[in-house]
Structure formats: structure tokens, C-alpha cells
Design a protein with these regions (language model features):
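Helix-coil boundary/capping segments in enzymes
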Residues: 1-121
Length: 121
């Protein structure tokens, strides 16, 4: 029996077009069209490799002979200081994005994310 090579901690970001308009309009979270930076308000972080995106991640995994990956997707969506409705809508979208990654390639990805507890009741 051959052994699986598993990446136990990785990230996948959505394509800029997959991010809801309200999030960019309210400066909650967005990715520049050239996919070089992710942003929240005045904060920005460089996207240092194309392999942070779905199709490119599959190419990267093939290059390094990785069979499966555990993904912490959208780890930058913290919801700090957000209104309740914005946090709820963003987390709902985040959940749907994670489900789409899992649904598209369940043989390659196990997806998860951190839920922010500010508005849990």
C-alpha cells in the first residue's frame, strides 16, 4: 500500500470575482483584480504565490506530489469591529466558499475555517 502525502495546513483564496460586492463596497474584504494583495479596510497583505488560488493550488500539489490538503480558507476574514449583519453575511459567504472548495475536489481538499465568536448567542 502506498503512503499518501498530505499537506496538513494550507490556504485557498477566492478569485476576486467570487467575493460579494458588498464586502468590497464596505471595505470588509477584497482581493485586487491582479491578485497581488488581499485587503480589509486600510490593512493589506501581499499574496505571495499564485498557488493560493484553487486551480493553481492543484498544479502546485501535483508539482510536489501532494495527494490531499487540509485547507484553512479565508483565514483573514476576522470580522473585527464589523456590524452584526455584515459579520453574519460574510461568514455565510465564507461557509459557502469552503463548501464549494470541498465540493469541487473532495478527493484533494478538506476545508475548514475559524468562526469568529463576537456575535454567537
Amino acid at each position: 500500500m502506498s503512503k499518501l502525502k498530505i499537506n496538513g495546513h494550507g490556504h485557498i483564496l477566492p478569485e476576486p470575482s467570487e467575493i460579494p460586492k458588498f464586502m468590497k463596497d464596505k471595505k470588509l474584504f477584497w482581493i485586487d483584480d491582479d491578485k497581488k494583495f488581499m485587503r480589509q479596510g486600510e490593512w493589506s497583505r501581499p499574496i505571495t504565490d499564485a498557488s493560493f488560488f484553487f486551480n493553481e493550488k492543484l498544479i502546485w500539489m501535483e508539482k510536489y506530489n501532494i495527494d490531499h490538503a487540509v485547507m484553512l480558507n479565508l483565514s483573514q476574514v476576522y470580522c473585527n469591529g464589523w456590524l452584526r449583519d455584515d459579520a453574519r453575511d460574510a461568514i455565510r459567504w465564507q461557509n459557502d466558499f469552503n463548501a464549494s472548495v470541498q465540493e469541487r475536489r473532495p478527493d484533494k481538499f478538506t476545508s475548514g475555517f475559524v468562526v469568529q465568536p463576537l456575535y454567537l448567542e
